[in-house]
Amino acid sequence: MEILYTEITQDLTEGLLEIALEELEKNRKVYYIVPSSMSFEKEKEILERLAKGSDTAVFDLLVTRFKQLPYYFDKREKATMKTELGTVGLSMLFRRVLRSFKKDEIPLYFSLQDSAGFLEMLIQLRAELLTANLSVENLPDNPKNQELKKILAKFEAELSVEYANYSEFGDFTNRLVDGEFDQQLKDVTIIIDGYTRFSAEEELFIESIQEKVARFVVGTYSDENSLTAGSETIYVGTSQMITRFRNKFPVELRKIASSAVNEVYSKLTRILDLDSRFVITDEKIELKAEDEKYFRIWEAENQKVEIERVAKEIRQKIIQGAFFKDFTVLVGDPAAYEITLKEVFDLYEIPFFYAQEESMSQHPLVIFFESLFAIKKNNYRTDDVVNLLKSKVYTDANLDEEVIDYFEYYVQKYKISGRKKFTEEFIESEFSQIELVNEMREKLLGSESPLQVFLGNNRKKTGKKWVSDLQGLLENGNVMTNMNAYFSAAELQNEHQMADKHEQVWQMLISTLNEFLAVFSDEKLKSVEFLDILLAGLKNAKYRQIPANVDVVNVKDYELVEPKTNKYIYAIGLSQTNFPRIKKNSTLLSDEERLEINQTTDENQFIEQLNVANYQKNQFTVLSLINSAKESLVLSMPQIMANEQGEFSPVFQLFLKDADEKILQKIQGVNLFESLEHIGNSRSVIAMIGQIERELVESEETSEDKRVFWSSIFRILVKSNADFQKILLDLAKDIDTVNLAPDTLEQIYGDKIYASVSSFERFYNCEYQYFLENTLSLETFENIDINSKIVGNFFHEVFEKVMKETDLSAENFDEKLTLVLQEVDKNYSRYFTQDATARFTWSNLEEIVRQTATVLKATVSTDELKTLLTESSFGLPKSELGNFSVDDIYLRGRIDRLDQLSTDYLGAIDYKSSAHSFKLQEAYDGLSLQFMTYLDVIKQAFPNQKIWGALYLQFKNQPINLSEINQLSEIANILKESMRYEGLVLEDAAEQIKGIENIALKKTNIYNEEEFEQLLKLNEEHYRAAGQRLKKGKIAINPIMKRSEGIDQSGNVRGCRYCPLKSICRFEANIHMNEHSREIGQKSQAEILAELKGEERDE
């Protein structure tokens, strides 16, 4: 055995390739072994080096991995008919083994038999024992491990009897010892590159083969000091490995001759070396200003700014002649950076390969199985059924996608949930597409549907029967047909990567089912157990990655780095929390147990002590990272990461201790003090020019800023870039609406506009809201709570029926109210039993009704105010109050109560489920039209009677803070004060109204006859103005805004506060407020009244 070592600042691979070429000249077969995590990149690098930069093939040199070696020497056909289980199958077998134990046999682990996490830990433990050349008997003796021994022993017994699983690598090692391959190995050279430690399994293989080959070479990183310094070294793992090999067999140890070294990276290595030795020295290693060319540390504002600066530098170096393949981006948290990096690199037109395994969990087929499992487990929850259908895998042959939308709308609106409701006919006949929805429901969810045939009963079946039944679902439910269609469509559109994904997922399903049959074929299972086992194999599966072999930027986890990786290295997202990465031992064996195993086992048996191994690995990873660049290295940390303040890693602090200030660079978003650093490509400059423009406007000019540069860039873009010109033209119109065409107006309105009173209040809140909700009839899903329409209708119906009762008096009021409540409850029960929120609301309704009814009871008992009509309508067929129109606008509505004073004055009572009061300002701005319209309708219907006004009555169950009262007797008065009518009253009737109990009268809401008439005219003017705009087809996005309120905490102006349609109009208060909102509340009450009395009103 030869062990060649060199310092990590040197090129180890260059020295090993010289040996490989020597051996090839001797006509020897060379096996060049590299770590599995970098085998593809290393093979590509080695072949390019041998061919001096161009692609080539060298038939007698194979870059490979330890576990692949048996394939090259053992060409025997496997003569077994047994199934070989993969990771999914092993998990299934462990599950079956666990299910075979009784609770008293494995009390600690019995409850974890279906835990995916525990099954994964068992697979991991078994794999560790194999690579450590250990068996279950080597586990320390304690109650936990006694259970693990039982589980693993039974598992191995069943595996060896029923399946073809065995360690090919271990078997190959045993056959090497027996001399089976001696003849083949005579002209073989084995070279090992990049290892700093080996597993027990690998060491046993090395011991078995190293004397049988022509030449056996191990190349690694170390220095003379480390070979004698023991543990106090940056090469501690390597020195331990070399010492172990030298003690076991003859070793020729030599150092590879020095080549040219980058002094900056040598300094960084020396800093780490001194730190790892814990020595106090007078040696001062400084990073100077000129070292910035080779090494920088960035402190970026945030992740996006950090990635953008990487992208800008890549684009600039490309212009200078570099290739994309010359760049490697290493990330501290691959999952956290994936989305942002892809977006930024796409913007900067940088091709890249992101070496992050992608889960299959988002594929439609996996979503289908997840939904299928959830449907059975949770008894057909609404969302689970909708997700199943929206996966578009399980469909009817001629299913229109629009029908799925109708179906979703129906089941969400009517809260359809539970198997019974989905298998029975939908009955809400007022739903316009009920026939289409029912047809789809019957075919896909009905009692004879493929889904119900598969899931319909809860009987246990054998595994093979479940697989057979699933095949029927896949065929009859068009799952197979749809998967084939997805694959063909992707191929047809040249989306070969997507087509490959479809194929991989389908193959994974077939493989999982085959392994399921191998393990559970004769086991009896319920459907939910079958789906759970199946899903465990699918949702954790990953797509195979095809490494990039073209001119692209490579992006990967920084832990996969190796020395001399590339010319330019950007290691980003390196914070205190992940650099170095601290890993906790989450296996079934503690560090103490691992130490005990290693102290009691034979020479070629040892298991990794994770606390020690992780420390050594972290140390070597940092060492590899700072030596990974050939020309330029950047280490970067964002100040904000995952919404938390980032802190410098100890490694950063170590390098910065004696570094020039130029080494640490603050990376900001675009600003006026930098120029060319921010130029990447034209698309990215266009994307950030808005920020630059804002900076130009908001900041004061200084002698140091680059505003002249940015103004020039702006002018160049305006003149030469058509895309930028279009953006500029569209900026001011990004939410501008287009007037409706005359023929469209004719179709939607005709000669007359028919609308409700409340809809015009919506018009004055925002014209676009009116257009969407009233013209286009868009509806939002309504959950039944205290503010929903259903609850409002419930209250109205209760009080309408009570107030219509004959012979109603204060004495029998409560009795009649109880009877009415019972009757109305029956009518509304289907709404209030839809879900938990609805049931909770229902439980509170009676309290609210009875509390509000105290006011009505007082009204019934007085002779001063009598109810003439309840729920009297206008503008509807057979309306009690007739029709009401303003020019060509025909209004409809319903007045909750028409009440008459003893003096024959008429007025309106309006019930509300939320707090309301009459405000002159809102009537002036068009936001409060109901009261004045109701009074206008009454005046028209009863021309010979005078009007007293209109009042609101809120339905509520007033809460009382008991800490604020002195005696319980005060509660009745407090409730009485809180339950009052409020509104506007005419001056002539004010005195009489004041004398009626439970009416709160404000001086500001008492109006004389002249003011009342002016208010009626103003109200009609609002309708006319709105009608004219509608008939001209004008629709503006103009939510109301009160200047004194501005933008609230949720980022809305007043008109958008409760609007559910913002995703359609895209109104953003901070951008559009000044141009697109309608300002209200600009006049005082005195000014409004003065204007009503004769002055011209501003429109």
UniProtKB/Swiss-Prot annotation:
Q: What is its EC number?
A: 3.1.-.-
An example GO BP is: double-strand break repair via homologous recombination
Q: Which Pfam families match?
A: ADDB_N (PF21445), PDDEXK_1 (PF12705)
Which cysteines in this chain are paired by disulphide bridges? none
The protein's UniProt keywords, in alphabetical order, are: 4Fe-4S, ATP-binding, DNA damage, DNA repair, DNA-binding, Exonuclease, Helicase, Hydrolase, Iron, Iron-sulfur, Metal-binding, Nuclease, Nucleotide-binding
Gene3D superfamilies xref list: 3.90.320.10, P-loop containing nucleotide triphosphate hydrolases
Superkingdom per UniProt:
Bacteria
Q: Which cofactor does it need?
A: Mg(2+); [4Fe-4S] cluster
Give the coiled coil ranges. none
- How, per the record, is the cofactor bound? Binds 1 [4Fe-4S] cluster.
The family database entries (InterPro entries) matched by this protein are listed as:
ADDB_N, DNA_helicase_suRexB, P-loop_NTPase, PDDEXK-like_dom_sf, PDDEXK_AddAB-type
Q: Give a GO molecular function annotation for the protein.
A: metal ion binding
Residue numbers binding [4Fe-4S] cluster: 766, 1056, 1059, 1065
| Function field | The heterodimer acts both as an ATP-dependent DNA helicase and an ATP-dependent, dual-direction single-stranded exonuclease. Recognizes the L.lactis chi site (5'-GCGCGTG-3'), which stimulates homologous recombination. This subunit has 5'->3' exonuclease activity. The heterodimer acts as both an ATP-dependent DNA helicase and an ATP-dependent, dual-direction single-stranded exonuclease. Recognizes the chi site generating a DNA molecule suitable for the initiation of homologous recombination. This subunit has 5' -> 3' nuclease activity but not helicase activity.
> Anything further noted?
Despite having helicase-like domains, this subunit does not have helicase activity.
Complexes and interactors: Heterodimer of RexA (AddA) and RexB.
| Protein family according to the UniProt entry | Belongs to the helicase family. AddB/RexB type 2 subfamily.
Q: What is this protein called?
A: Exonuclease/helicase subunit RexB
